[in-house]
Amino acid sequence: MRHQDVAIIIPSRLSSTRLKQKPLQLIGSITLIERVFKQVNQAGLEHTYVATDSEEIASVITKVGGKVIFTDSAIPTGTNRTYEAFKLIPNNQNINYIVNVQGDMPFIEPSSILKIIEYLKNSKYDIVTPIVKVDRESVKASSNVTVAVDSAGTALYFSRSLIPNGAEEFLYHVGMYGFRKNALEKFVSLKPTFLEKTERLEQLRVLENGMTIGTCLVENVPISVDTEEDLKKAVKFYENISKLGL
């Protein structure tokens, strides 16, 4: 298998404030977390894991041949859960890169995962994350995050507000990160920062501490399921692609 020095970790927990038992919600006949895992697994990496505190989530994943790492329910963020899971991977001294894929993107494209891995390995960035060019209408919801970058594609700032102000085209941030191992270790050792807490975006902790985030363009905005309305959109999308035989 390719990228033996990379681990993909999908953090997933049952407790969600906006959508009860979110990972176990059905899209068609398959749970959200199973769909995420199956999409990620298509990237073809041996070290692919779901990190969870839930026996129910673990059961869903192991039944389809996936690997699960149990983590403490008190872990505060997905990135911290990713790091705790990484520490429990057997022979993890051979892993130099960790990809954190959020467990709420049921149609995430495997090509996007592979793209950030290649970009991370061939750059000097601490972290790499995908972005998509979109228009104003596509990102006006407060749950969406936009990013401002410099001419080289280095992230300058992330916000739940539309940035830059007055633009008609924006860069939508996809919730997936490729970390160098030492960057992930450093991130979890840092305390939450002012901008991070203000925007409720943990990636700002990286920028406020002088670390670098590179961005790479991907083609499509993946559906993220955070609310009941998001779930309805995901089900509708699934029904549409099923009719097309995709």
Curated annotation (Swiss-Prot):
Its EC number is 2.7.7.38. One of its GO terms (molecular function) is 3-deoxy-manno-octulosonate cytidylyltransferase activity. GO terms for biological process: CMP-keto-3-deoxy-D-manno-octulosonic acid biosynthetic process; lipopolysaccharide biosynthetic process. It is an enzyme of class 2 (transferase). Pathway: Nucleotide-sugar biosynthesis; CMP-3-deoxy-D-manno-octulosonate biosynthesis; CMP-3-deoxy-D-manno-octulosonate from 3-deoxy-D-manno-octulosonate and CTP: step 1/1; Bacterial outer membrane biogenesis; lipopolysaccharide biosynthesis. It holds the Pfam family CTP_transf_3. Keywords: Cytoplasm, Lipopolysaccharide biosynthesis, Nucleotidyltransferase, Transferase. It comes from the Bacteria. InterPro entries: Cytidylyl_trans (IPR003329), KdsB (IPR004528), Nucleotide-diphossugar_trans (IPR029044). One of its GO terms (cellular component) is cytosol. It is found in: Cytoplasm. It catalyses: 3-deoxy-alpha-D-manno-oct-2-ulosonate + CTP = CMP-3-deoxy-beta-D-manno-octulosonate + diphosphate. Activates KDO (a required 8-carbon sugar) for incorporation into bacterial lipopolysaccharide in Gram-negative bacteria. PANTHER family: 3-DEOXY-MANNO-OCTULOSONATE CYTIDYLYLTRANSFERASE, 3-DEOXY-MANNO-OCTULOSONATE CYTIDYLYLTRANSFERASE, MITOCHONDRIAL. Belongs to the KdsB family. This is 3-deoxy-manno-octulosonate cytidylyltransferase.
